Amino acid sequence: MKPIKFEALLKNTIWGGNDINHLKQLPEGTKAVGESWEISGVPGNETIVTAGDDLGATLPALIRKYGATLVGAENFKRYGETFPLLIKFISAAQPLSIQVHPDDAMANTMGHPFGKTEMWYIIGTHEGARLCSGFAHDYSADAYTQGVEDGSIEEHLAYHTTHVGDCFFIPAGRIHSIGAGNFLIEIQQSSNDTFRVYDFNRTDDLGNRRELHVEQARQALNFKAEGDYRTHYSARLGEASLMVQCPQFTTRLIRTEQTMQVDYAAIDSFVILIAYEGEAKLTDAEGNEVLLQAGESLLLPASNSALAIEPQGITRFSCVETFIP
């Protein structure tokens, strides 16, 4: 089964920047894109195939057609026709709302299959870029309620200056916000459940404020502080370097200036590549070839056992790789 590209869903947001527009070389005058949903099976937001025999098919339709060949036997048994991950580029000119996501158990009570554990990999920053991940100290539900009422909750959050290459793991229940000036790749469980705690009193084009979910957020939040919210990893050129490993996904960083081989024989899962620098010719174990350039994402079927990555031109090729462990 051949590698698959999808048409990204471009989302205009009140906080969106221009980094996605530039990376994807969108036409001049295109409204700022805050989010690009690269690969999605979220109902109502399914990405569609851009070429080949399955041109125009949605991701859920592909799973129905190919089953375990596409997603892996264990994934098909566990998730059925529901694709378990959602892949995005995010560009923020203004801070996103302070928010939290539910875990699987809470999401199930809402009738949804997944909570939302996610991670961020920073691929670009502007002056003063920072983000919020977690509380600066142990907090409590009562203090949270008071902090929301009097507006002091921001004083209790852990803020982090960001740089290209930074990685943050955001488990369900952790309060967080992407700050202005960040351009990042987000890998998350396939869920659109977000509980907004505070949205900086912003209004949309019609003058309306976005809905807050203060009580649901209180139920979802983990109020215990961590000592270090950054994810530390060691990256080397020409290798698939581990960044995040959790029950929901494994994510590795691939950067190379020459042809490299990646072995997937032991992985019973689809593999997603999200390219953010350069261009490469990819050749799978069956000899299928495809070009992948910065701003594009690719789904490798679980039936594929290996991949050759050959950078094109004189630039380095860099991508984030993720799959289900």
Task: Label every model-predicted segment.
Residues 1-139, 201-227, 251:
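Transition-metal
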Residues 80-82, 90-95, 104, 125-128, ...:
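Ligand-binding loop in jelly-roll beta-barrel domains
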Residues 87-88, 96, 118-121, 159-160, ...:
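His/acidic/aromatic-lined binding-pocket segments of jelly-roll/cupin-type domains
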Residues 100-102, 123-126, 135-137, 148, ...:
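Short, structured patches in soluble enzyme cores that scaffold and shape functional sites
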Residues 132-155, 185-227, 313-325:
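Double-stranded beta-helix
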Residues 157-169, 284-304:
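Short acidic-glycine-tyrosine-enriched beta hairpin
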Residues 195-267:
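C-terminal amphipathic alpha-helical segment
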Residues 260-262, 278-283, 297:
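Short beta-strand segments in beta-sandwich/barrel cores
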